[in-house]
């Protein structure tokens, strides 16, 4: 203990100290078990292998998913210990490939030889989406559904939440026209995808939320787009009504970080905030120079609710709830960034009878005024 009396320092060794630490130890062990179960599920989905065999290969590779996947796929073909399908179990006849293998496919931007943008830098587009990687049901088909949206809209930037390691590995393989920056490497996390040849990555920073119970943080990425400097941010703020106080603390951290960027830098935050409107009011509202894109556009009804259990039955919740959990905040020099449109994506059911996620994604287009 850094400070305090000797009696304070000795307290944890007594019965009261042991009793106080027991719940924390139990919670830590429960979290560890949950993370490893999640790793096993994701590994089995990607590897197309018997789930009962997964823990052993992960243990042999220190529970490092990427290392374990590499070791697994490099096993000799005559090794009968791991009956498996071809390396990517996501693949099917209806598979949507984001690697732009078809030379005639113009939906994915390829980097230009000169390194200059291939499109008008006065307009930028992005998608923010909680892709619900924690739901293992129909995950391969749902991942293809998300990728088909990326191929269709070809956004400059993609903000993702609830990404798991196998999903990230899949994106790195299939979304080869994007640079992927993640907020973590284990459990579940956020990610920001930057279109190569269009968005130049400069640096990244991860801001921890010290009191989170759900592995949440703030991912910040500094980029250059069309000669303009941007600070891109995403987060998945604490979930559920019971964690409102922590969510408000996290929102204050986000807004504070948005104010730290130089005045000449445009700041965009997009993510799953889990916010209720009254929580923004409790936080003191948005700063005068930070705007909510949906409110800026006149609060259009067609894209108000991004989590709607009546329209989206992925969670099979009998009651009907709808919230504007997914939000976009921006800070720019006056008049230099103007939202033009905001739409929901991922609205079509897949062949499996489910949507790509329990959240709708948000597609936003903005004009950059020099």
UniProtKB/Swiss-Prot annotation:
Disordered: annotated segments: 1-32
InterPro entries on file: Endo/exonu/phosph_ase_sf (IPR036691), Endo/exonuclease/phosphatase (IPR005135), TDP2-like (IPR051547)
EC number: 3.1.4.-
Skewed-composition ranges (Low complexity): 9-26
Keyword Acetylation carried by entry: yes
GO cellular component terms listed in the entry, alphabetical order: aggresome; cytoplasm; nucleolus; PML body
Gene Ontology biological-process annotations: double-strand break repair; neuron development
Cofactor note: Binds 1 magnesium or manganese ion per subunit.
N-acetylmethionine carried by residues: 1
Cofactor annotation: Mg(2+); Mn(2+)
Interaction with 5' end of substrate DNA: annotated segments: 130-134, 236-241, 274-276, 315-321
Localization of this protein: Nucleus; Nucleus, PML body; Nucleus, Nucleolus; Cytoplasm
Top enzyme class: hydrolase
Keyword Nucleus among record annotations: yes
Miscellaneous field: Can partially complement the absence of Tdp1 due to its weak 3'-tyrosyl DNA phosphodiesterase activity.
Primary role: DNA repair enzyme that can remove a variety of covalent adducts from DNA through hydrolysis of a 5'-phosphodiester bond, giving rise to DNA with a free 5' phosphate. Catalyzes the hydrolysis of dead-end complexes between DNA and the topoisomerase 2 (TOP2) active site tyrosine residue. The 5'-tyrosyl DNA phosphodiesterase activity can enable the repair of TOP2-induced DNA double-strand breaks/DSBs without the need for nuclease activity, creating a 'clean' DSB with 5'-phosphate termini that are ready for ligation.
Family: Belongs to the CCR4/nocturin family.
Protein name listed in UniProt: Tyrosyl-DNA phosphodiesterase 2
Naturally occurring in which organism (per UniProt): Mus musculus (Mouse)
Organism lineage: Eukaryota, Metazoa, Chordata, Craniata, Vertebrata
Gene name of the encoded protein: Tdp2
């Amino acid at each position: 203990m850094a400070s305090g009396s000797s009696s304070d320092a000795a307290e944890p060794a007594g019965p009261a100290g042991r009793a106080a630490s027991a719940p924390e130890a139990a919670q830590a062990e429960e979290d560890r078990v949950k993370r490893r179960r999640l790793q096993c599920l994701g590994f089995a989905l990607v590897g197309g292998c018997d789930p009962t065999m997964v823990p052993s290969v992960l243990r042999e590779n220190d529970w490092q998913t990427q290392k374990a996947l590499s070791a697994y796929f490099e096993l000799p073909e005559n090794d009968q210990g791991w009956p498996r399908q071809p390396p990517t179990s996501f693949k099917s006849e209806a598979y949507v490939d984001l690697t732009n293998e078809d030379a005639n496919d113009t939906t994915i931007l390829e980097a230009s030889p000169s390194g200059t943008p291939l499109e008008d830098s006065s307009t930028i587009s992005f998608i923010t989406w909680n892709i619900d990687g924690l739901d293992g049901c129909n995950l391969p088909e749902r991942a293809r559904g998300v990728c088909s949206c990326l191929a269709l809209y070809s956004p400059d930037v993609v903000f993702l939440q609830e990404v798991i390691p196998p999903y990230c590995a899949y994106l790195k393989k299939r979304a080869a026209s994007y640079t992927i920056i993640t907020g973590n490497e284990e459990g579940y996390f956020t990610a920001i995808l930057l279109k190569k040849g269009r968005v130049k990555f400069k640096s990244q920073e991860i801001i921890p939320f010290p009191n989170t119970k759900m592995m949440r943080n703030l991912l910040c990425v500094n980029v250059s787009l069309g000669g303009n400097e941007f600070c891109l941010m995403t987060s998945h703020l604490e979930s559920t009504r019971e964690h409102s106080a922590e969510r408000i603390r996290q929102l204050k951290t986000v807004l504070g970080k948005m104010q730290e960027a130089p005045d000449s830098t445009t700041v965009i935050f997009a993510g799953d905030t889990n916010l209720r409107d009254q929580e923004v009011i409790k936080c003191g509202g948005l700063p005068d120079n930070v705007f909510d894109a949906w409110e800026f556009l006149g609060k259009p009804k067609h894209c108000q609710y991004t989590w709607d259990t009546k329209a989206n039955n992925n969670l099979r919740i009998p009651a009907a709830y709808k919230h504007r959990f997914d939000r976009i905040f921006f800070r720019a020099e006056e008049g230099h960034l103007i939202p033009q449109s905001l739409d929901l994506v991922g609205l079509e059911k897949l062949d499996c009878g489910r949507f790509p996620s329990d959240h709708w994604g948000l597609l936003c287009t903005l004009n950059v005024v020099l």
